Amino acid sequence: MSVSLYDYYGQTRTATDPFNLDHWRDDCKPHLPWADNHFLERVSGAPLNPGATYQDWRHGASAHSFTDENGQFNHTYMERMWPKWADKLGVLQTTDDYERQMLIVDPLRVNRGIRGEYGDLHDLVKLLVREPHTRQAYLPLYFPEDTGASGRKPCTLGYQFILRNQRLHCYYPMRSCDYANHFRDDCYLAVRLLLWVINQCRIADPLGPWNDVMPGSLTIHCTSFHLFANDFIALCQEESNLWTTS
């Protein structure tokens, strides 16, 4: 049983020091230190599966039930952000595993789409550096193979970045999000990705316009923004306790 929420979240946060992560930790209230450690896995450049930080997630014990006979998930954020070598290097828990496998992999075996090679998060940064005002800086996480397939599907459809008036904005569409268990982490990880992209553009083009670019808006669209009944009851009890003790 689930309880649907029909609330519209049209809030905008403006930080005087937007690159100060403590501000965003206080604002988003993610589950730490897991969220920070998992973010580093996501931007490591390696298509890790299963990775390591899932074991430290607060529901990590049940996550094992979603792995296959090799101990891998049917997808990870790391695979989707860095898909060029995904599923060609065996079980990858750490970047050390990835680096060892890359020493022996055939460079011609990179994953391809219908017409060309897969792009990744690094290619998105290169596109922004090359064409700062592009409308094409989109990183898909929901792949064609997910349509019609059984099993788990990515909740995140992708991330789009667009630069306007010296502010880099992020549009974050989701097919589904659990308010109680995932929303805070999803918001925080999206903000961290936005800050990371700006920083990577500055590194790639130190004399370009990116030193003057600041974070803009984070726009999240979620088709199914839901809350399960047991979580709804727990949140109501928590709210009641706050009123009682205040």
What are the functions of these language-model segments?
Residues 1-246:
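Terminal, non-catalytic protein-protein interaction segments that mediate quaternary/complex assembly
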